[in-house]
């Protein structure tokens, strides 16, 4: 017996009973109309009787005069209502559940991840069928607070990131916060879709819920320190190397910065100090190139310089720190004394020579020039005298016998006798000059009378 839109029934005798089999149509779900089954005994009587006004023998109820009618499908002739003692079979077809396996993914810090849950009926059987979301039956995220599906396409999980769903495909994208690492709490994904129709032709749906749990692996950039070697008083540069922890998370452009002693980010130049805390120069950095510059402010200083702290960060904001250390190669100018001889009572002069200090750095010879017009005479206490001021020239006993003057442009020292009767040894004139760094060098000029 076939009921269109529902299925077919097959009955088989089983002694005094009847076996009934219902084979539903492929899309039918819910409660069927059912069938009524009437039996006839050997006398020709049937189960098709009901409220006919006759007393029931050995019936039910207080007076034993009633029976519960089985079938509400049949209305007997001359009966005011439906009901008979016929057999009744009403099958119910349970909707197929939709299932979906949880999804996971793993990628590096800061990078978006995505997965698409697959919804199925009869999963793992020969009748397995994929249920695809659509515009009319969209997949939805489950709000982590209310625990129910939400119409919102994007859900934010504090401290982790945002989940965005494509309702028509079910694809979920997780965009982690740049600083988040580890296994996320995950997000629920729900799909309600039709799995069949009932006897009225109305669609019957089933709902499945699964989860998507991404994991974020940390990315840590690395750094190599830089050093440089330069001549005393010379500006030096060095470029620390910053390397991304992953190709997907490069070092942020323009992020190279200097740090103050306390680790805070410097807003400008940072003092370069000697080990005793004295300022000997300044550090600056070009954020675009990452080049750090050491500019000496005390060009006379030779010795260790406390390294500059240099920091950069990747696109996730993960910071890494290293150092830049300049080394100063000291140079000292040299001097050659001068002598002269002349007759008693005559002025005489000699030219002292000053030569730049030199050093070879990385195979290149470098020098620091003598400062122009820096030659001066020194008094008996070793102090420079003002330009144009003569210095007394004395004999071995401390008696003044003349005066020394100097031409700083030529380094020529002139002895002018004031006691023209004197002959013999004259105490040499002390002459000093300095290079461009301010490093001083001394020599002498000795006249003989």
Which residues are covered by each model-predicted region?
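Acidic, turn/loop-rich segments in luminal/extracellular domains of secretory-pathway
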Residues: 2-64, 80, 153-207, 272-321, ...
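Extracellular interdomain linkers/hinges and stalk-like, low-complexity segments
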Residues: 38-129, 192-253, 314-366, 435-449
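Surface-exposed or secretory-pathway low-complexity segments enriched in glycine-proline
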Residues: 1-19, 23, 88, 112-169, ...
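Intrinsically disordered, low-complexity proline-rich tandem-repeat tracts
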Residues: 24, 91, 98, 102, ...
């Amino acid at each position: 017996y076939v009921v269109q839109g529902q299925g077919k029934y097959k009955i088989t005798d089983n002694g005094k009973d009847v076996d009934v089999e219902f084979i539903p149509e492929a899309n039918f779900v819910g409660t069927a109309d059912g069938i009524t089954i009437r039996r006839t005994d050997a006398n020709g009587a049937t189960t098709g009787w009901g409220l006919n006004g006759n007393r029931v023998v050995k019936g039910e109820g207080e007076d034993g005069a009633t029976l519960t009618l089985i079938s509400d499908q049949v209305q007997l002739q001359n009966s005011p209502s439906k009901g008979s003692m016929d057999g009744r079979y009403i099958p119910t077809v349970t909707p197929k559940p939709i299932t979906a396996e949880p999804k996971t993914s793993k990628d590096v810090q800061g990078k978006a991840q995505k997965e698409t849950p697959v919804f199925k009926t009869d999963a793992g059987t020969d009748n397995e069928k994929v249920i695809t979301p659509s515009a009319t039956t969209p997949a939805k995220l489950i709000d982590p607070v209310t625990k129910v599906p939400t119409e919102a396409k994007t859900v934010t999980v504090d401290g982790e990131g945002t989940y965005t769903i494509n309702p028509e495909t079910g694809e979920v994208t997780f965009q982690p916060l740049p600083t988040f690492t580890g296994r996320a709490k995950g997000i629920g994904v729900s799909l309600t879709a039709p799995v069949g129709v009932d006897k009225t032709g109305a669609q019957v749906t089933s709902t499945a819920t699964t989860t998507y749990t991404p994991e974020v692996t940390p990315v840590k950039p690395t750094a190599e320190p830089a050093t440089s070697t330069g001549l005393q008083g010379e500006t030096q540069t060095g470029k620390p190397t910053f390397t991304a922890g992953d190709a997907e998370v490069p070092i942020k452009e323009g992020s190279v910065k200097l740090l103050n002693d306390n680790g805070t980010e410097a807003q400008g130049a940072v003092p370069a100090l000697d080990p005793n805390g004295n300022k000997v120069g300044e550090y600056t950095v070009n954020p675009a190139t990452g080049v750090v510059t050491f500019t000496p402010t005390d060009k006379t200083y030779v010795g260790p310089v406390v390294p500059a702290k240099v920091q950069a960060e990747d696109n996730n904001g993960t910071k890494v720190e290293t150092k830049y250390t300049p080394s100063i190669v000291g140079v000292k100018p040299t001097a050659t004394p001068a002598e002269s001889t002349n007759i008693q009572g005559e002025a005489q002069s000699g030219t002292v020579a000053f030569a730049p200090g030199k050093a070879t750095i990385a195979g290149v010879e470098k020098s620091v020039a003598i400062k122009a017009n820096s030659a001066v005479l020194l008094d008996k206490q070793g102090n420079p005298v003002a330009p144009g001021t003569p210095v007394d020239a004395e004999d071995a006993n401390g008696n003044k016998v003349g005066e020394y003057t100097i031409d700083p442009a030529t380094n020529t020292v002139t002895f002018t006798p004031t006691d023209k009767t004197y002959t013999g040894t004259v105490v040499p004139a002390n002459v000093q000059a300095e290079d461009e760094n301010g490093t001083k060098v001394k020599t002498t000029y000795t006249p003989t009378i």
